[in-house]
């Protein structure tokens, strides 16, 4: 049974694939069997983790709902780094299936990112729903709190910033946001400790 299809560029044919093909890539990524529902959701999204654009934009994904804790994902210290097996191997599986099940990701042929992007490797993390002052992303998008979801985003550039002393950070933050392209609004990934400053 076909569970998804991907292609490296808009000018190439789609490749269709089965659960077995997705599972093979999950095993190659070091994923445990209990991660497969999340990896299958990535595969079924139809969005490749490997874009073919000279801007080198990359995908990242946010996991919501009960599955986050059921499979041991981390939304705390090091959640976006190489420290949690579930976070990293799910992201790596998404990357591998995007290469192997879409017809390749060959630089100069099916991959045209000029310099590439380190975010292409494995950026998957859960939202810290319990520590956020806002509704979880999936609830904002119309899902129930008890639903488990995968949301895939594209990002061209990324900026990791600390905005200095408490007295001046708000003004510096406003300037940083104002510098973003208006037709490409930013996605803010904010530590739960910092969110208290927003509410």
Predicted regions and their residues:
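Non-transmembrane, aqueous-exposed alpha-helical and coiled segments at domain scale
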Residues: 1-199
């Amino acid at each position: 049974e076909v569970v998804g299809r991907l292609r490296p560029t808009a000018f190439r044919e789609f490749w269709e694939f089965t659960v077995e093909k997705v599972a093979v890539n999950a095993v190659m990524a070091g994923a445990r069997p209990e991660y497969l529902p999340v990896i299958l959701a990535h595969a079924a999204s139809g969005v490749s983790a490997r874009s073919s654009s000279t801007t080198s934009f990359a995908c990242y994904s946010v996991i919501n709902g009960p599955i986050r804790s059921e499979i041991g994902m981390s939304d705390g210290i090091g959640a976006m780094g190489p420290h949690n097996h579930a976070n990293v191997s799910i992201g790596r599986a998404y990357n591998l299936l995007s290469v192997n099940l879409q017809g390749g990701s060959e630089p100069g042929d099916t991959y045209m990112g000029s310099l590439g992007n380190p975010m292409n490797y494995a950026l998957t993390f859960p939202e810290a729903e319990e520590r956020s002052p806002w509704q979880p992303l999936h609830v904002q998008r119309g899902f129930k709190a008890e639903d488990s979801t995968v949301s895939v985003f594209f990002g061209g550039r990324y900026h990791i910033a600390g905005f200095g002393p408490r007295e001046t950070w708000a003004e510096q933050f406003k300037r940083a946001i104002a510098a973003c392209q208006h037709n490409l609004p930013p996605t803010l990934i904010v530590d739960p400790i910092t969110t208290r400053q927003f509410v």
